[in-house]
A protein has these predicted regions:
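Short, structural beta-strand-to-alpha-helix junction motif
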Residues: 1-4, 40
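N-terminal acidic leader/helix
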Residues: 3-23
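Detector for the mature cores of small, proteolytically processed
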Residues: 16-69
């Protein structure tokens, strides 16, 4: 299973309240995943990915942290 597939799978689980929004450098939304999924993302993607902006946005009244990759 690819990372993208894993992200999609977790994203569809509605029980989470805090999410990570992953964007590319063009500010396009790539994925939205639960905060609890953060460690798997850090383990699997480049270390540059960890230059993680703690930008807080609102996504359907939920807290969203933004990563730019």
């Amino acid at each position: 299973m690819t990372i993208r597939e894993k992200l999609q799978t977790v994203k569809t689980n509605k029980k989470y309240r805090t999410f990570i929004l992953i964007k590319n450098k063009n500010n396009e939304k790539l994925e939205l995943v639960p905060l609890t999924f953060q460690s798997m993302i850090k383990d699997k993607l480049d270390q540059e990915f960890i230059s993680f902006k703690k930008e807080i946005e609102h996504y359907t009244k939920e807290t969203v942290l933004t990563f730019v990759i």
